[in-house]
């Protein structure tokens, strides 16, 4: 087991180094691989990880000693940075990395970018973490969500900061960004 843990630690450290040195598209793909690895490790070991005590000002780079808070912070940080090179990701077809990931056969690979793939993964993650769909000082929830089903311009102009849940704010902002992009591209099929 000690050998296995050493190997895991080496892989994570090498991956983090590769992420720092990689070009934008490779960096985003490697960040997503990193996220998958640490999420999987956390899921398999969360019973023991959750027993660990959080330490103030801990900047431990050894993921084998991370607490639940450390894992969540790393996952969130990497999801937050995942789409930071939007233009390059949008201009790179998923075809270039289709061998790395399981891409559904229903996906039109010629019209699906690395950005589309990673934005979908980020959106799935955000949806799984949302705890409240309400606005701050919510009065009439039904009328408040109607904005999401109106025309695209109304949706884009919606102030997501009114929402209670930070992850819902991130999700709506991600969707608004996509909506804006496809409106500007006049690609109404993707709206």
Regions inferred by a protein language model and the residue ranges of each:
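Extracytoplasmic/secretory-pathway proteins
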Residues: 1-191
């Amino acid at each position: 087991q000690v050998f296995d843990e050493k190997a895991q630690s080496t892989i994570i450290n090498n991956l983090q180094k590769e992420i720092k040195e990689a070009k934008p598209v490779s960096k985003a793909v490697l960040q997503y691989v990193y996220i998958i690895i640490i999420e999987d490790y956390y899921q398999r070991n969360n019973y023991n990880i959750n027993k660990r005590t959080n330490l103030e000002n801990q900047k431990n780079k050894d993921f084998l000693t991370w607490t639940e808070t450390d894992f969540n912070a790393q996952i969130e940080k990497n999801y937050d940075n995942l789409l930071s090179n939007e233009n390059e990701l949008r201009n790179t077809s998923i075809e270039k990395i289709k061998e790395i990931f399981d891409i559904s056969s229903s996906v039109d690979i010629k019209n699906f970018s690395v950005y589309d793939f990673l934005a979908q993964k980020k959106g799935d993650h955000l949806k799984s973490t949302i705890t409240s769909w309400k606005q701050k000082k919510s009065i009439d929830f039904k009328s408040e969500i109607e904005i999401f089903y109106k025309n695209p311009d109304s949706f884009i102009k919606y102030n997501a900061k009114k929402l209670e849940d930070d992850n819902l704010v991130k999700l709506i902002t991600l969707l608004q960004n996509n909506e804006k992009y496809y409106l500007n591209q006049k690609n109404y099929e993707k709206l």
